Design a protein with these regions (language model features):
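N-terminal cap/lid segment of alpha/beta-hydrolase-fold proteins
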Residues: 19-65
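Cap/lid segment of the alpha/beta-hydrolase catalytic domain
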Residues: 87-90, 95-146, 196-208
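Extracellular ligand-binding interfaces
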Residues: 450-526, 542-547, 552-553
Length: 554
């Protein structure tokens, strides 16, 4: 078939893919590390003219037990294949093959070697081919990366594994959707963050003025049709576990829901969200992964993944959110709600505990605030420690609220941790977060909040929230050592800008009442905020330990 300038589909792109060439595998080194034997391996991939792609990976097995099955792990493009995430998969008794699909990168010694004709398969040379299809979907870095994954599945099959879980992180998950769609040797699929819609990056699903990328040009249309991972969701037939954060900057939470809605009804599909997180997943996601692995490729399963559904019914000026999780034992059921914030990465998700009615049904009755649209999902913590979520739902409501509040609470410990999350940035070492929010008892037995990485609030993105030159940030703080607190406001006027103020605190065994003028916040070069309507978040950070409470704008 002549692929030049053609508009391909997933089927026409991969329908005749041939991975019958011999692997010619070699082992470069072998070492014993933390109860596992890790081998550096090379094997051959597809042919490009008279040359073959030479694939590099880490193959690891437990040194004292027979592996229950195999995991093929595809990392993110800024992640080393021997990252802590790889080691997390290794620690639960499975063989793990972590492959490099991204080719030569800065500082890399061993890496997948691509023939010169497909130089763009090296991520540093991908250029436009990572985001557009100028000629054919077959002439993109994505095609080469997926082809590497297909040969990696073959490698695991040839060394004796019948049960193979494909797991991908971020960009690696987008690669994984394409593999899972057409490689029947894959038993199940774990996708972390990546769920397609790459061409729609920064295009808000709920912004009426946003321009659809497929309206732009042929290059975008061809990309969406055959490269973007969401196009592959209807073709996946194996069980899926989808894990993501609600506030990911790069992987849109709303768009991910659209991808999951494309999965066929008969395909087991489980979801779990790390609420308020950005680059990482919560520690509880590890238990969900274990349950999924044990169920589909393990020899036995004491814990299993669970389906959770959420139904929304309007009752006058209220919405009733009803949770459905079968007859399973649950420790905690809650519904997370945000009203009025269209951009997923900027939402402050408010947690509401579900109550039980006389029929045993668990639900939340939410009072509509008339901000145009309500977003919600249900999270259930089960008795076995797993936490699974419903798909996100949204409901348009009448928009009658134009009020701007001059005084508004951001956080109070009386309302739990609502209003706060933590600064969640670099996840190149491990996808699972080791830093979160702590609730700490301060003077007079009053509880406050602290995070080693810094506290962050999206409350300022609320449509009702108003900042002016006259606004004052007020909060209580407790420290037991000298503590310079860096307070930062985040503005989005097409690019993210930061404006900060440093508040120095001395050690005192009391709650110190702090007042800071919003007009005192400055950029690195001394500029003040020009458009307060564009401020969407605030952070509090210090190298010293601090506890804060009763944060509000007056």
């Amino acid at each position: 078939m002549n692929f030049k300038n053609s508009l391909l589909t997933p089927i026409s792109l991969w329908g005749d893919f041939d991975d019958s060439l011999p692997l010619k595998s070699t082992t470069v080194s072998k070492m014993k590390v933390d109860g596992a034997i890790i081998s550096e391996v090379y094997f051959s991939g597809r042919a490009v003219g008279n040359e073959r792609v030479r694939i590099f990976g880490y193959y690891s097995v437990p040194d004292d037990i027979t592996p229950k099955g195999a995991i093929l792990y595809i990392p993110n493009d800024n992640e080393k294949i021997g990252s802590d995430t790889f080691k997390e998969f290794l620690s639960v008794g499975y063989a793990v093959l972590a492959i490099d699909v991204y080719g030569k990168r800065e500082g890399s010694v061993n890496h997948t070697e691509y023939p010169t004709a497909v130089y763009y398969a090296n991520v540093v040379n991908a250029g436009r081919r990572k985001d557009f299809v100028d000629e054919s979907a077959k002439e993109t870095c994505w095609y080469e990366w997926v082809a590497v994954g297909r040969y990696a599945v073959k490698y695991l099959k040839e060394i004796g594994f019948d049960s193979i879980c494909l797991a991908g992180n971020k960009i690696g998950a987008n690669v994984g959707w394409q593999i899972a769609a057409f490689d029947k040797r894959v038993t199940c699929f774990i996708a972390m963050f990546g769920a397609g819609w790459t061409a729609y990056k920064n295009v808000c699903k709920f912004d009426e003025n946003a321009k659809e990328p497929i309206e732009a040009d042929d290059s975008s249309r061809k990309y969406v049709a055959a490269v973007d991972a969401h196009a592959y969701a209807p073709y996946v037939r194996c069980p899926i576990l989808y894990l993501t954060s609600t506030n990911s900057t790069f992987f849109d939470f709303d768009r991910a829901g659209d991808t999951l809605s494309r999965v066929n009804d008969g395909v087991p599909c489980f979801t779990a969200y790390s609420v308020g997180y950005d680059a990482h997943l919560s520690e509880s996601a590890k238990i969900d992964v274990l349950a999924f692995l044990e169920t589909y490729i393990g020899k036995k399963s004491q814990i299993r993944p669970k389906h959770v559904d959420l139904v929304c019914k309007q009752e006058g000026d209220k919405l009733r959110f009803e949770a459905d999780y079968g007859n399973l034992k649950a420790k905690n059921i809650c519904v997370y709600v945000n009203e009025g914030v269209k951009y997923a990465s900027k939402r402050d998700w408010v947690r509401y505990e579900a109550t039980e009615d006389e029929l045993g049904k668990r639900s939340v009755l939410y009072s509509i605030e008339s901000k145009g649209i309500v977003f919600a999902f249900c999270s259930v913590e089960f008795a076995d420690g797993t936490v699974f979520c419903s798909k996100e739902i949204f409901k348009k409501v009448e928009k009658t609220s134009d009020k701007k509040l001059s005084s508004k609470l951001i956080y109070s410990s009386k309302k739990g941790l609502n209003g706060l999350t933590f600064i969640d940035e670099d996840a190149s070492i491990s996808i699972f977060a080791d830093k979160n929010i702590e609730e700490i008892i301060g003077p007079d037995g009053i509880v406050g909040a602290y995070s080693q990485s810094g506290l962050l609030s999206f409350k300022l993105c609320d449509p009702d929230f108003s900042l002016t030159d006259a606004s004052i940030l007020k909060f209580d703080a407790f420290v037991n050592e000298y503590c310079p607190l860096t307070l930062t406001l985040y503005e989005d006027d097409g690019e993210i800008k930061k404006y900060s103020f440093t508040q120095e605190l001395k050690s005192e065994n009391i709650w110190q009442n702090i007042l800071v003028k919003i007009s005192d916040f400055k950029s690195d070069v001394g500029f003040v905020i020009k458009n307060y309507d564009k401020v969407f978040a605030m952070s509090i950070k210090s190298d010293a330990k601090f506890v804060i409470n009763n944060v509000l704008i007056i």
